[in-house]
Amino acid sequence: MKLFKRSRQLHGWPAALMLAILALTAVGCGNEKTDTAAGAKPQGDLTLVVGAYSVAKDAMGDILPLFAAKWKADTGQTIVFQQSYEASGTQARSIVGGFEADVTLLAMQGDVEKLVKAGLVEPTWKDRGENGMVTRSVVALGTREGNPKGIKDFSDLAKPGVKVLYPNPKTSGGAQWDINAIYGAGLKHSEEQEGVKDPAAAKAFLESIHANVESLDKSGRASMAAFEYGVGDVIVTYENELLARIAQGIKYEVIIPKDTILIENPAAVVAKYADEHGTRKASEALLDYLLTPEAQEIFAKYGFRPVNKEVYAANESHYPIPAGLFDINYLGGWDEVRSTLYSKRGIWYQVLAGI
């Protein structure tokens, strides 16, 4: 793989891609750093480029050196990783636009499907492991220590004086999970009250909460930073984000709503780029490694719900199952969600426009 040749392709890239490159960090067996933007040759036999969503950054920081050590033991090759972490939607657009990631971890299946549509990821990507998924979580609520606003469920987010944070679903895959959870909870409420799903009632429920939103940030991590800076009373986010911050000593109260959505996070080989770089074998090995007990334990350490059954069972007590838990299929699947919620004139557009 000729990194210098690849670095020349940076000229003319859109601004979002330049930001992705500026965010690149390198992790290798000896923590070597690479600088492909300057054309420097990396200190390794093989370079893998990982383009992931921002929430995965901390766990991958622990996982990649372990995979590099295993690859070295198995093949004798030293691997250097170049890593870019962005909001999931931004990362997917960057890869479609020319950011040559070999492997991608994204917040949702819909973002991987964008890469399939662009001819970058093979349509069979879900055949690997747990339908292509490497972690799970649920949408949860985080409040300040002691839960001063008495938040118990999504419905409390619509109360007067409650300031809410969640990121923008146009840039953040995590935010789409958040909006899906709120909208789905609205459908669940209507089903309980009327016996059928009522999209109008679900939209009204989403509108009532959105009216209390303090700001729409670019990514889940940006919303978390704003909350910890003192903005808002409650944040809608991934359960794993809250658990990871608590493990780092940050004071949060975690509330799992009665009706919330199961999050599933995929990973895939970006086959077109991996084949061009001659990294397909290593890229597939990394995906397989993400499913091993060793890697899944690390994901669990950072608050994710493992897809490995044995690791999940060992940590099951940490993962409450709410009574009304639903998955994306309750909303009709990703194609239906994209059409109903996030299309040009969809429900999210209507909520923003106040129509």
Task: Describe the predicted segments one by one.
Residues C29-A118, D127-R128, Y238:
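Early extracytoplasmic/lumenal segment of secretory-pathway proteins
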Residues S190-P257:
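Ligand-binding pocket segment of bilobal, Venus flytrap-like solute-binding proteins
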Residues V116-H189:
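A conserved helix-loop-strand patch within extracytoplasmic ligand-binding domains
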Residues M1-D45:
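Short, low-complexity disordered leader/linker segments with a strong preference
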Residues M133-S137, K203-H210, D217, Q248-R280, ...:
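Periplasmic-binding protein-like
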Residues G98-T104, G161-K163, Y229-T237:
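Alpha-to-beta junction loops
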Residues S54-D58, S88-Q91, G110-E113, L141, ...:
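Solvent-exposed loop/turn segments at secondary-structure junctions
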Residues A274-I355:
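Extracellular/periplasmic juxtamembrane helices and adjacent flexible linkers that interface
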